[in-house]
Amino acid sequence: MQDAENVAAPEAAEERAEPARQQPVSESPPTDEAAGSGGSEVGRTEDAEEDAEARPEPEVRAKPAAQSEEETAASPAASPTPQSAQEPSAPGKAEAGGEQARHPSARAEEEGGSDGSAAEAEPRALENGEADEPSFSDPEDFVDDVSEEELLGDVLKDRPQEADGIDSVIVVDNVPQVGPDRLEKLKNVIHKIFSKFGKIINDYYPEEDGKTKGYIFLEYASPAHAVDAVKNADGYKLDKQHTFRVNLFTDFDKYMTISDEWDIPEKQPFKDLGNLRYWLEEAECRDQYSVIFESGDRTSIFWNDVKDPVSIEERARWTETYVRWSPKGTYLATFHQRGIALWGGDKFKQIQRFSHQGVQLIDFSPCERYLVTFSPLMDTQDDPQAIIIWDILTGHKKRGFHCESSAHWPIFKWSHDGKFFARMTLDTLSIYETPSMGLLDKKSLKISGIKDFSWSPGGNIIAFWVPEDKDIPARVTLMQLPTRQEIRVRNLFNVVDCKLHWQKNGDYLCVKVDRTPKGTQGVVTNFEIFRMREKQVPVDVVEMKETIIAFAWEPNGSKFAVLHGEAPRISVSFYHVKSNGKIELIKMFDKQQANTIFWSPQGQFVVLAGLRSMNGALAFVDTSDCTVMNIAEHYMASDVEWDPTGRYVVTSVSWWSHKVDNAYWLWTFQGRLLQKNNKDRFCQLLWRPRPPTLLSQDQIKQIKKDLKKYSKIFEQKDRLSQSKASKELVERRRTMMEDFRQYRKMAQELYMKQKNERLELRGGVDTDELDSNVDDWEEETIEFFVTEEVIPLGSQE
């Protein structure tokens, strides 16, 4: 079984790094000059020995008297003894010098140890003050193959480097060619653009025939500013005719050293990952789900089956926290201290890994091409590492980002097709495009006071809202991308808060608006319904004066459900958005014990659940005629998960939220309980998603029309399955009975073999035969006399 914890580095690298973890870091070998001066080293060690003998406390080591300050600084600070500092691990001349420089008493101790006279070595060690000193020297056969970059990479990158002064210079091409009359204006424009990245201390505009040449040189106060300018200003569009190309001046040397001869790249072997969507070809069309139990120590993958779940794969310590499926179900992501691993295929082999120390959160792009990881541990001003976007196919890092402390996950939100992703900061909405990972049109949107935004699941439309500012009303804006055209703006007044809820197909947008009308107390909620598929995007409003607990759209329909009121008077209302724009109340159920709404992925059916504090009350509702099919309870249920087909639903009690009664129960969409699966310290269950169907809407309609024809085939398969299950049950019981008979026969034979031993132990009395003869029985009757006393109630006094 493949080790799931091997994420950030191959096993070979771990084995190479193992000696470094077991031994202290070896010091760098001394110079040839120091190695050759063996006599002076001995003299210094003799002085050190005299100083050590003169000290009253032998535990305190004396610094060599003849050692200079430079040599002191060069010796490792972490070395506990001068011996370990003078015994280099490198071979050759340095090793010979180190051997000469060793303390004479140390050689005497080795000779005494080789002769076996430990009693003589001990007094010498006490005289030298080395009785309790541990040895941190490397063994003679130790080979340190761990480089300094691996151990001290974060420290070495900040070491001083020699600079020739041109690291701070950049070259800007495609600059407008102007004469002396417009040169000053051009300089002001250039300075305004490039001074955002740092202080410009010098500039140079080459001229020819009275005009600039079309390229300029800018020098910054720091090389970091120059790098920042290249990163952000390259590709900047000044106007329709001029788009800047920015490079470092030092890049000239890099490009001039490129060989004129073309080296044919090595052909990379194709890595066959197998069929990553094999589960979709399962004959019974069953779904898979993952289960984490034993407080996270074990993770299993199961086939969902009506009778019992069928285990596919089970591994210990597969993940360190939790798991997550990709949006189309292709990959299973596991979390580790050193990064993320992706698994897939019929054997769940490791597909890819991404090294991100301390990763806590991830997010996939809807197209499964990119992975976003977040870690609070790694982030620097020069090298942003808090958020990293990875290419899943290649495993390469695409870009890193900083993370604000007040941000909410997911920080980046993806468009429905994965072509764009966006993030919100103070008064700014930044939209990036793939695969370049650069800003759309090289600039962010300045939106003063922006509070929240959300992508449409059905198109490249982004919705955002801005609160009121003095006399300016709050507004909700719909923007088409990449053109940035505002297709609808809705002004709102007396707004406290807004929430954006998209219908799964992007047909509707509901903006839940909490507001405080003038002259009234309390909060009133409006549901602003945007009909996205109609011209000019008309808006309808539903007002509710009760407290709103939950809101949810039907995934593939035009209905939505609202939980409102306060316990114990909680109600659920179902609304239907008609084609003419009228919003109709279909049904309202009173006195519901629910705080969450869970729609089936296929629509029509919904589960109203009272999770955690409401003790797991469940109501299964069919919204086609608004009937309650069943009311049940899973005590202290913490989660509800629909399967991708909408046929089954799982309720569970997670060990993460409740420490007892941890289990998951499987129900039909009608509310009929099929299974109760108890798992020790059960933590999490996640269904494996399915990719979108390849069938067209016309084909789906035709299948629904011919459902009766297919249902006969399904019923026949069900009967065969039941018959097969019955045969399997009978066969299993027959096998169990046969196993019992064999065990009973073996026990009887063993019992008879031990008869002689029993006779000997019981003085020749055959106790086996005492109960076999009825004539030897003695019958004894024992009578118990019971006195009954009746006391009338009236005569108790």
Swiss-Prot record:
Biased composition (Low complexity): 63-91
Region called Disordered, residue ranges: 1-141
Region span, Sufficient for interaction with EIF3E: 107-396
RRM domain ranges (all copies): 168-251
WD repeat intervals: 315-353, 355-400, 404-442, 543-584, 632-677
Post-translational modification: Phosphorylated. Phosphorylation is enhanced upon serum stimulation.
Positions where N6-acetyllysine occurs in the chain: K192, K271, K347
Keyword Electron transport: no
A Pfam entry, by short name: RRM_1
Keywords assigned by UniProt, alphabetized: Acetylation, Cytoplasm, Initiation factor, Phosphoprotein, Protein biosynthesis, Repeat, RNA-binding, WD repeat
Biased composition (Basic and acidic residues): 53-62, 100-110
Protein name as annotated: Eukaryotic translation initiation factor 3 subunit B
Gene name of the record: Eif3b
